[in-house]
Design a protein with these regions (language model features):
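Conserved core of the PLP fold type I
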Residues: 32-33, 38-180
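Conserved N-terminal helix/loop that builds the PLP phosphate-binding region
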Residues: 1-33
Length: 181
């Protein structure tokens, strides 16, 4: 059943709840530590503080029966910067494919590095980006392209549709990537 209200934007979301008390307390403590010469630490390790990595393993993964070593956990400053930075290891002339709708950063990061081509007037789409429609007709799961695409952004659970892929559905994409290596 379609929603009774118009959809305004399916891009970057907006928070709906205030920060939890534990976060506020931790931020205040960190600010106090940064304000004193005795407790000031400067920049943290680029892979994340050991205490944070251990806490992630202990409190997030271990209760679900998932076991990681600290070297397998990477702490970053958010998806946007990592999504943008991954392009640094890719070729400038790689072709790009995105699900549509898509988290805007996947396109924006390719625009900034010159990989997206020319913005087509009227459509708002980029000439060197293959848009793979995700609609109710295909259960918001894109078709495997019939041409080679060098970089395909798959984000599941999908933002903004919430769709997930099964292992067999993901295997189709792995097979596509291997066939187009």
């Amino acid at each position: 059943t379609p929603p009774k209200q118009d959809i305004i934007r399916l891009g970057i979301g907006h928070v709906t709840q205030p920060l939890p008390k534990a976060c506020i307390e931790a931020m205040h403590k960190a600010v106090e530590e940064l304000a004193s010469k005795d407790t000031f630490r400067g920049y943290g390790p680029e892979q994340g503080y050991d205490f944070l990595i251990e806490a992630i393993i202990k409190n997030d993964f271990a209760p679900r029966g998932i076991h990681f070593s600290p070297s397998e956990i990477f702490v970053n400053d958010g998806a946007k910067s990592d999504t943008g930075n991954i392009g640094d290891i890719l070729r400038h002339d790689n072709s790009v494919g995105v699900t549509d709708p898509i988290y805007p950063v996947y396109i924006d990061s390719n625009v900034m590095c010159g990989r997206a081509g020319v913005l087509e007037e009227g459509t708002g789409k980029w000439s060197n980006v293959t848009y793979m429609p995700c609609t109710s007709e295909n259960d918001f799961i894109p078709e495997i392209p019939d041409k080679r695409i060098d970089i395909v952004y798959l984000c599941y659970p999908n933002n903004p549709t919430g769709t997930t892929l099964t292992k067999p559905e993901l295997k189709k994409w792995v097979d596509y990537a291997l066939a187009n290596d």
